[in-house]
């Protein structure tokens, strides 16, 4: 997995081992962000629920979003590691919550 566009383009994203997390495929994220680009993502606030790897939030920040919140019960440390690797951790808030209740 990697970041598709923006300032962190090409940076690898780590995923947790096992089947608990199914990261959004690169091509799916690319399609979503191509649509969002037409609506303007620059300066936006992003909420990434069930964030897993943090790839969606990190992709948004890489493409100019002002701030992102990543919510995931198990993978907060991994999300932070990925965000630091992509140099967007200063604009990312991680909330370790279980939302399935």
Predicted regions and their residues:
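Class I S-adenosyl-L-methionine-dependent methyltransferase catalytic core
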Residues: 1-101
């Amino acid at each position: 997995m990697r970041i598709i566009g923006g300032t962190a383009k090409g940076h690898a994203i780590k995923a947790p081992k096992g089947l608990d997390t199914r990261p959004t495929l690169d091509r799916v994220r690319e399609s979503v962000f191509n649509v969002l680009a037409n609506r303007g993502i620059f300066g936006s606030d992003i909420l990434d629920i069930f964030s897993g790897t943090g790839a969606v939030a990190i992709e948004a920040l890489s493409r100019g979003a002002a701030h992102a919140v990543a919510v995931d019960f198990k993978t907060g440390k991994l999300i932070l590691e990925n965000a630091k690797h992509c140099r967007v951790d200063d604009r990312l808030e991680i909330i370790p919550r279980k939302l399935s209740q």
